[in-house]
From Swiss-Prot:
Entry annotated with the keyword Membrane: yes
Positions glycosylated per UniProt: 7, 24
Species of the source: Human adenovirus B serotype 7
Keyword entries, A-Z: Early protein, Glycoprotein, Host membrane, Host nucleus, Membrane, Transmembrane, Transmembrane helix
Membrane topology: Single-pass membrane protein
Protein name (database record): Early E3 7.7 kDa protein
Domain of life assignment: Viruses
Membrane-spanning parts: 44-64
Subcellular location: Host nucleus membrane
Cellular component, GO, one term: membrane
Length: 66
């Protein structure tokens, strides 16, 4: 539920930023506003994937030698 809310918030922010870009004809500050949010989501996702991989390897070796 939290992921869906944050994704819709990011989409709204992207749309409003693009609207401001059309008015001001500038694109430099758009990336400053958008990138940190996606970078944080990407970092959390990568950490979760690495954690699941490590956990699965540990469980595999624990249960494979029975």
């Amino acid at each position: 539920m939290i992921l869906f809310q944050s994704n819709t918030t990011n989409t709204i922010n992207v749309q409003t930023t693009l609207n401001h870009d059309m008015e001001n004809h500038t694109t430099s500050y758009a990336y400053i506003n958008i990138q940190p949010k996606y970078a944080m989501h990407l970092k959390i996702t990568i950490l979760i994937v690495i954690g699941i991989l490590i956990l699965s390897v540990i469980l595999y070796f624990l249960f494979s030698y029975d």
